[in-house]
Structure formats: structure tokens, C-alpha cells
Amino acid sequence: MAAAAGAAARGGGVIPAGKGGSLRSPGKPVVLADITNTGRPNPTGSVHAIADVLKENAKLRHLLAERNKVIEVSRVELQKIRLALQAMQQKNLQLVQANSQMFAEINQGKDRIKLLQHELACTIAVLKVKGSELEKMSKTSNNQQNRAKILEKKTRSSKCAPTKAHQMAAGSIREHLVEIQSAVPSYTSCHEPPQDKTNKRCTNRRKSESCEVTMDTNTVQHSCRPHVEYNGSSHDDDPRKTRRRRSARLNPGSFEVAEICDKLHEDATVPSAPSSNVPKLQEPNAGKDMICGGKMKSLQKELPCDAIAQVVEAPELKEIQEAGSSVAGGEAHKFDIEDPEPPRKSMRIDANKRKLESFESRLASNKEDCINAICDSTSSVPIQHEQKRKLSRRKSSRLDPGPWEVTNGTFEIVQEDTVAPSAPSSSNALIEQTKNDMQNDRSCSTKPSDEQVIGRRSSVGRPSRRAAEKIVSYKEVPLNIKMRRP
């Protein structure tokens, strides 16, 4: 207000009078100053008003100073807050960086875990595959070992089977031969042939066969000696048997011939032995042999061996012939045996066939030597010529099945000659009879073969020719027409 009054005074205006007086001139218009109180005159108390104004100014200044102080304090606090905020921001950045690093490490760890899991799964799969392969290999190796063992067993059995079968067949045939030889009457008597002729014949043969043939002929000669002359020669027989066995071990052919000669030797020793040895015969003709043995015992005391040989009847001679023919059949059956072997062993089969052929030739040569040695001493000159002709014919046909029958027939003839040396007429008749029988057997054996050949040729004939038929059409015949009955 004081300022307004001072401004009005400076302006030189007239302060209008209020209600107490009218300070304006007449005739002038009304102005704004006339409305306000600035135009009033200063009262007497204006000094006090100035003092109040000064006080008020001081207060205002004091308030301004306080305001300035507050502003400065707020500025300082703001700066502090800004600094704290910057520190917090830095810390936050650090925490964010640490967090990002932690997350990156976690992600890397997860990736590594995944890779390790994948590797572990792959290794497990590989180990499983290797284990399965090892199991398969072990199974296959076990199967191969089992198959190899089975094949070895089969090969061993297949190798042993033919030998066992051959041994069984040979053993059965030997037993059959022994039984047949035991069925022959035991009162044979023969004279010892001169050793010069046998030795000359042996020297004409090969060196490899000479030793075996001489041993076999010597055994046959010792077996054919009459046992009336010596009874207590048991000590002399043992070394002879051992020598014969030693030579027979090296030669399979001479072994069987030696066995046959041993059986003949035992049969020849029966008349001088007691009657307890006679019932050992196991053939169906054993009863007849027992009866004949009783007759021969009664005649032994009265007659010599040559007279006893004449008492033998024709049926007994027939039995001897049948026994010899059965021996021939057994031997022929023995040499015709062929073991069933697989086709892979053709070389072994050929070797066995060669061995059998050599064995047959050795047996034939041994029997021929025995027959010649016996017949030279007992039979006459024309009989010797006939036998020489037969032997020459046999040598040319040793590989045929016929010579076995011929040799066995001659063996029967020799036995009959040894049985009855004092009756040459009966022996000649028997020789002629056996010749006729052998010729008939040969003719019968050859005829069916010719008939079989003719039948085969007729059965394998050429089909009858037909004229060329006219072809109606080259189309295929329908099924219903094909299925029709003719």
C-alpha cells in the first residue's frame, strides 16, 4: 500500500477526497484515482508504517535465506541419492553379469550332460552289440566244436564199422569152417609124402610166397600123419604149433589154412584118444559119427588103419562130400563178402579187393601144394596126371568164382583117398563122380547167366516204329478234352 501511495505521489495527481471532503475540482471527469484511496493525504502515523514495512522485509529476507538453505540441503541429498543410485546400478550390472555367467555355465553343463548321456547311450549300445556278437561267436564256435566232435565220432564209427563187420564176418565164417571140419570123420589115415617133391615145387614159386607155402605144407603133412605110430608126442607138437602161429601172424592166408590143418590134425588124433573126445561134435551128423566111432572102436582092436578105411560105407562118403562142399560154399561166401562202405572210400575198397585177390591166390596155391603132396604119395600115376591137368586149368582161372568149388572138390577127393588108400577102385570112382558133379554144377551155373542175359536183351529191346501221324492243329488241346477217358 505504501508503494501504491508513493507511486501516486510521484505521479503528481490529486488525491480525491473521500467521504470526509471532496478534493476534486468541479468540471473535471471522474478518474480511477478518484475511486482509490491513494489520493488521501498521509496521516500522522506514517512513520510507524514504514517501520512495519521494514520488519516485514526482514522477515521475507529471512524466509528467503531459509528457503535457499533448504534448497542447498536438498541438492546435497539429491547428489547423495544419485551416487547411491549409481552404485546400485553398478551392483545391479555386476549381479546381472554374474547371473548371465551362471546361466551360461548352467546351459553349458546341461549341454555337456546331454552329450555325455548321448555318449553313454552309444557306448552301451556298442557294448551290447559286441556282447551279442561275442555270444554269437561263442555259440557258433560251440556248435562247430560239437559238429566237429560228431563228425569225428561218425568218421571213427564209419572207419571202424567196415573193419568190425569184416572181422565179424570173418569170425563167423571161421567158426562155420571149424564146425564143418569138426563134422568130418576122424579116422583119416595117410602116408607122409616125400619132402623132395614139395621142396622142388616150392622153389619154382616166388620168394615171397615160398616160406609161407613150405610152412603150410609142412603143417598139413604133420596133420595127415597116422597117429597110430606115435601116441605120446604132445611135447613135440607144442613147438611146431608155436612156429606155425608165428608164421601165421605175418600171413593171413596161411593162418586160416593152418587152422584148417589143425582141425584135421585133431580129427586124425581122435581114434588113438579115449572115447570122451568123440561127443564134442556140434553138427546134425554128430549122432552118425558117434555110431561110426563105436563101430570103429570095435574094429580098431582087430584090424589095422587100412582095413578100417575099407569098412566106411557110401553114405558116410556122401556126408564127407557134403561137408567139403559146405566148406567150399563157406569159403566162397567168405570171399564174396563186400562190406557196405561209403563212396568216398573207393581207394580202400580197391585195396581190400586186391588183398582179397592175393589172399585167394595164396589159399589156392597152398591147397594145391597140399593136394599135390598128398596125391603124390597115395594115388597112382594116371590120377597124378589128371590132377596136374586140373591144377594147370585152375591156375589160369583163379580170379573166377569157379576155382573155389574145384579146389574144394579136390580137397574132398584127397580126404576120400586118405580115408581109403587100400581101395583104389572106390577112390577112382569117387573122383569120376566128383568130376561129373562139378561139370554139371558149372553147366547149371553158366546156363542161367545166359538166360538172364537173353532176358535182359529182350527186355531192353528197341520200341516198335510208328508211321508219322498227321498233325491236325498246333493249338493246345482244351482241358476237358484232355481229361476224357480213352
From Swiss-Prot:
Biased composition (Polar residues): 423-433
Principal cellular location given in the protein's record: nucleus
Compositionally skewed regions (Basic residues) per UniProt: 387-396
Family: Belongs to the shugoshin family.
UniProt subcellular location: Nucleus, Nucleolus; Chromosome, Centromere
Tissue specificity field: Highly expressed in roots. Expressed in panicles. Expressed at low levels in leaves.
Pfam families on file: Shugoshin_C
Keyword vocabulary terms for this entry: Cell cycle, Cell division, Centromere, Chromosome, Chromosome partition, Coiled coil, Meiosis, Nucleus
Primary role: Plays a central role in chromosome cohesion during meiosis I by preventing premature dissociation of cohesin complex from centromeres after prophase, when most of cohesin complex dissociates from chromosomes arms. Required for the timely assembly and maintenance of synaptonemal complex (SC) during early prophase I. Required for maintenance of centromeric cohesion before prophase II and correct segregation of chromatids during meiosis II. Has apparently no function in mitosis.
Protein name: Shugoshin-1
Residue ranges, annotated region (Disordered): 137-163, 187-209, 222-251, 323-346, 382-403, 418-467
One Gene Ontology cellular component: nucleolus
Superkingdom of the source species: Eukaryota
Basic and acidic residues bias spans: 331-346
Coiled coil: 71-154
Summary of the knockout phenotype: Complete sterility, due to shrunken and inviable pollen grains. Premature separation of sister chromatids before metaphase II causes defective meiosis of the male meiocyte.
An individual GO BP term: maintenance of meiotic sister chromatid cohesion
